[in-house]
A protein has these predicted regions:
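NAD(P)+-binding Rossmann beta1-loop-alpha1 motif at the extreme N-terminus of oxidoreductases
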Residues: 1-51, 60-63, 90
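Short, hydrophobic beta-strand segments that form beta-sheet elements in well-ordered domains
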Residues: 29, 151-152
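Rossmann-like NAD(P)(H) cofactor-binding subdomain of soluble oxidoreductases
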Residues: 62-70, 74-146, 153
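Residue-level signal for pocket-adjacent positions within structured domains
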Residues: 35, 44-50, 54-56, 103, ...
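A short helix-to-beta-strand connector/capping loop
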Residues: 51-60, 125-127
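Conserved short-loop catalytic and cofactor-binding motifs
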Residues: 28, 56, 104, 108
């Protein structure tokens, strides 16, 4: 069982947190917005992003990045690509050397056209970064439907 922190409570981050939890991992889900973390903790559902999908009680939800990054084996970056540089800068001091970061955000940075994984590598040089991508949808993953993804470093 791995300790995994998913950084981002959008549909993709939440769906992956549920999948990882259902596969026996210890999962923490972090929101950059403490009020959203509090709401998700109370309702255990995000009706705007994943209506009808319950977040299992075993997933810890926090709005505190220090708590989320205290000791995970793997960190999943699931924030939108438009915010990835700011999130990476914010979290960089809390990421240890050799920490595994799995980027699941798609796209490029608007002003530089840099792929998201390159932004993370630039802002968090002490981490080992890989990318998970494929033809999948958060709604399907959250319901446990089959999908295909690959990881590349």
């Amino acid at each position: 069982m791995a300790k995994i922190s998913v950084m981002g409570t959008g549909s993709w981050g939440t769906a992956l947190a549920i999948l990882l939890h259902n596969n026996g991992h210890q999962v923490m889900l972090w929101s950059a917005h403490p009020e959203k973390a509090a709401s998700l903790n109370q309702t255990r559902e995000d009706p705007k992003k994943l209506p009808g999908i319950k977040i299992p009680d075993g997933i810890v939800i926090t709005g505190d990045e220090k708590t989320a990054l205290d000791s995970p084996d793997i960190v999943v970056f699931a924030s939108p690509s438009a915010y990835m540089r700011a999130i990476s800068k914010r979290l960089s001091p809390l990421i240890r050397r050799g920490q595994i970061i799995v980027n699941v955000a798609k796209g490029v940075e608007e002003n530089t056209l840099m792929p998201v994984c390159d932004i993370i590598k630039e802002e968090i040089p002490q981490a080992d970064v890989c990318v998970l991508s494929g033809p999948s949808h958060a709604e399907e993953v959250s319901r446990g439907l089959p999908t295909t993804c690959v990881v590349s470093a």
